[in-house]
Swiss-Prot record:
Gene: ybdZ
Keyword Transmembrane helix: no
InterPro entries noted in UniProt: MbtH-like_dom, MbtH-like_sf, MLP_fam
One GO CC term on file: cytosol
Consequence of gene loss (knockout): Cells lacking this gene are not able to produce enough enterobactin for efficient growth.
Gene3D superfamilies recorded: Structural Genomics, Unknown Function 30-nov-00 1gh9 Mol_id
Pfam families per the UniProt record, alphabetical: MbtH
Key words, A-Z: Enterobactin biosynthesis
Protein name: Enterobactin biosynthesis protein YbdZ
Length: 72
């Protein structure tokens, strides 16, 4: 089955990106990388990316919000 949206393709190759707030994103290899995001892992399968995220992403809370809470 062909996927019109590259973000939905389970057979696609994806980068793992991270922004300044410590949030992660899967990004299709064939798409232009967004500004403000750094490559954490080179393109790999969606399943491999999900395994990496499960092992490394501990919170959904952005870094700036966590720092604000700790300061109070």
């Amino acid at each position: 089955m062909a996927f019109s949206n590259p973000f939905d393709d389970p057979q696609g190759a994806f980068y793992i990106l991270r922004n300044a707030q410590g949030q992660f994103s899967l990004w299709p290899q064939q798409c232009v990388l967004p500004a403000g995001w750094d490559i954490v892992c080179q393109p790999q399968s969606q399943a491999s990316c999900q395994q990496w995220l499960e092992a490394h992403w501990r919170t959904l809370t952005p870094t700036n919000f966590t720092q604000l809470q700790e300061a109070q």
